[in-house]
C-alpha cells in the first residue's frame, strides 16, 4: 500500500503541475512533509515512536498514539480493542524501561506524575509505581522480563506486524487502486498472450493431424481405387483356370461359334501356352492350325471330330470344351466390365464403347476400361490435392458467436458505442434496443417510437446518449440509462426524412442530413420509408447542430444543387467530414472553415455508405453500382482501388417468402466496417458477414472468412475493436443480430 500511496502522490503532483495549480501543489508538499501517517509506511511510524522515546517527549508520544487511535485504530471492530490496549500499555512500559536504563529516573517519576490519574485504577499498573525507587529493577522478578532485549524486540515486531495487517485490510479510495489495477492488467495481458500462443500451437497441431489423417485416407482410397477385388480376380484368369475348366468339361458339349475369341486371347496370355497341350508344335504348325480352325468353322460343326482320332493338337480344330470355357470367360469379362463402369460412373458413350469391345474381344475391352479409368483417377487426385493442399493460416479465430433475437422485424441500424460495451439497434417498426454483451447478453433499455425512425448515432462524449432521427423531421436525444427522452428538436418541416446523423468526436456538435420525401413514399403511410432503388433523387440539406444548446449552427452548401445526403462520417479529430449523396457525389467538408473542400462523382447511382480509411489518407465508399472504391483525399477523384461486390453486399436487399411475399430494403446502416488496423473489411451477404483482405494487388477482393449464422440477408454491419478481441455485428432482415467474437492471429 505504501508504494501505491507514493506513486499516487507523484501522479497528483504531476497533474497539479500540468494544470498550473502551483499554490495547491505547494500546500500538498507542505502537508506531505508533516504527514503523521508517513505515507502508510509502517517502518517510519515505528521509527517516529522510538524517536519520541529517545528524546523523552512524553507529551508528543501520547499525542501521536492518540492520533493513530483516532485515524487508524478507530476503524477496527470492537474485538480488536483489547489488542490495541495491550499495545498501548507495552508502549508506555517500553518508555519507562528506557528511562531507567538511561538513568533518567526523573523522567520515570514525571511519567507517573502525569499518568497517575489514568493508570492508578488499572490492575496491570499497580506494581509499576515503585519502579523509579528500586535500586536494581532489572534484577527484580517482577520487572526483569521487561529489561531483557528479547522483550523489546518482541514488542517492536508485534507493533510492526499489527500496523502492517491494519494497512492491508483497511478500505482505500479508488485512486489508490490505480497501481494495483495496472499490475493486474499487465498480468492478465501476459496470461492472455501465453494462452494465445498455446491456442495457436494447438490449432497448428490440430491442422497437422487433420492433414496427416486426410493424406492417409487419400492414400488408402487411391490404393483401393487402383486395385479393386474384382480386378485382382481378373488377373488370375490365366491358363491355370483354363486347365481346371478343361478338366471338368463334358465331352458331349457342342462346338462354340466364337473360336476367334480364343485365337485373339491366346497371343496375349501371361503364362506359357505350352500348358494347353503337349502336342503343340512350332510357329508354322500354329499358323496352319489356325487356318484349319477357320476352315472348319465354315462347316458350323455338323459332325464332331475328336482330336484323339485325328492325332492333331487342341488348336487344330474346334473343341467342344473350349466353347464352354470361352463362353464363361466372356460372360465374366462382361460382368466385370459392367461393375467397373458403375464404379467409375463413365458416360453413356463410354459404356457403349466398352460393351462393343467386350463383345468383340476380351483384351481390347480391358484396355478400353483402363483408358477410361485413367482420367477419372487423375481428376480425383487433382481435386484432392487442390482441397487438401497447404492452406494459408486464417487471420482470425472465431471464439464465439451469439444471437440477439429481441427484434421481430428487419434491422435498419446496429451500432456499438465508443467504449465497446453496449449496442444500439433499430428496426423498421421503430423499436430501439440498447443491450450489452459482456459478460452476458442483456437488454439495458427498450423503447418504441410513435413516429418512424430512419437514423441512429451514439453520442461521443456522453456515451449514454443516443441521437435518433425520424421520418417526420425531428431528432430525439435519448438517455439509455435513465430510459427516457431528454429532448426532441424540429429540424425541418419541408424535409422530414432525417437520413443520417454523425456526432463529432469532440462531442460539441453533430451533423444532420434532412431530405424531402422520396418519390415512392406515401403521405398517409405510417410505416418507415425504407427506400426504393433510384427513388431518392430529391432535395436535401446538411445541417450542423450544437450538442449542448441543441441549436442549429449553420447549413452546409451542397453544390451543384441541394441533394439528399445518405451517409456521413467524421475523421478521428472531427476536422473533416465526408458525405455520400443520392447523386453519386462524395463531398469532403473542412469543419474548421465550414466549407466543402472537394467533391467528385464517385458512383453511378446513389452512394450508400462512406467511411475514412484507417490512416485517413483515403475515403472508402459503396454505391448503388455495386462497387467498393477507395479514393485518395489528397487528389480529388483519384481512385486508389476499385472492386466489384456481390449484389447481396450492396443492396437493395430482398427477402422472399411463401405465396409471393417479397420485402425489399435499400441500405440505411453501415455496409462495411474495418478491423483495428484497417487491413480487413467486414461486409454484408445473404447468409452472414464476410471478411475480405484489403491491400492486395489482385482485382478481386480476397475472401478470408465467412461468419455465417444468418437465414436472411444481412443489411448492416459493425466491427468494434475497443476490447482485446474484435467484435463483429451482423444484422439481418429477419430481426436477428449475430455477435461474433474474433481473435486476431498475430504473425
Swiss-Prot record:
The alphabetical list of record keywords is: Coiled coil, Endosome, Membrane, Phosphoprotein, Repeat, WD repeat
Give residue ranges of the WD repeats.
Answer: 406-445, 448-488, 511-555, 560-599, 602-641, 664-702, 709-747
Keyword Coiled coil tagged: yes
Where do transmembrane segments lie in this chain?
A: none
- GO MF annotation list: phosphatidylinositol 3-kinase inhibitor activity; phosphatidylinositol 3-kinase regulator activity
In the record, Phosphoserine modifications are located at: 256, 288
Family, per entry: Belongs to the WD repeat WDR91 family.
The chain's coiled-coil residues are 183-227
Q: Which SMART domains match?
A: WD40 (SM00320)
The UniProt regions of compositional bias labelled Low complexity, in chain numbering, are 265-278
> What is this protein's name?
WD repeat-containing protein 91
Looking at the UniProt record for this protein, which Gene Ontology cellular component terms does it annotate, in alphabetical order?
cytosol; early endosome membrane; endosome membrane; late endosome membrane
**Polar residues bias located where?**
283-299, 344-353
What Gene3D superfamilies does the database record attribute to this sequence?
YVTN repeat-like/Quinoprotein amine dehydrogenase (2.130.10.10)
